[in-house]
Amino acid sequence: MYWKVRKTSPEQIARQYGVHAALGISLLLNLILATTRPAMPKVSAELKVSFEQFAKQVTEHLLDTSYISYSDSTVALLRDELAPAVVKQLQDSEMLAKSDDDLRATAKTLTEERQVCAVKIKSIDPSELTPNGMLPVEVKGLVAIHSAQESGPTGPVNFDFKFLIGGKVGADGKPAYAADGKTPLPVVANFQDASTKPQ
């Protein structure tokens, strides 16, 4: 019997086994990338609690229209709690006083109307840290406003705020820490009002 000897060229081998080789190389590279990628930063439990409390405090200050505490809350937001870009964003949307005169005028109006407000936080939901070490936190709840002249909403209004909280940087460009020297001082680096507007 006569057997035909087959000549195989590198081209034929590549055509026949090329897909398998490419798949094997791709699988190997993906395995290497998966095992050597940098780990996503994890947030400690203490820091998460600290940032949650900070988000609650900022929310209360943003919604504070009580004549007793409005000025102090607004000054705290402007000086300590918000990054300059967020201050500008909130001033442009008229959620914050644009100047000291504006702050005094609003405080005077609130005092004349004897306006008070109550904020009820329903949920504070932190997410995972972003790659640059910031913690997204969503705060939902209700705010009720009452004044002697009954101006403003007649019932509680829902709110939904989304904050991106990071560590504050001092004037020297280094991270600022609390008195314990370990806990970074938080600051709101980004803000989004996702509240549904009342009809």
Indicate where each model-derived feature is located.
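Structured, amphipathic secondary-structure segments that form assembly/contact surfaces
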Residues: 2-20, 37-45, 49, 64, ...
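Hydrophobic membrane-insertion alpha-helices, especially the h-region
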Residues: 18-35
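Active-site-proximal helix/loop capping residues that flank conserved catalytic or ligand/cofactor
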Residues: 26-28, 56, 75-76
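N-terminal alpha-helical signal peptides/signal-anchor transmembrane segments
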Residues: 55-66
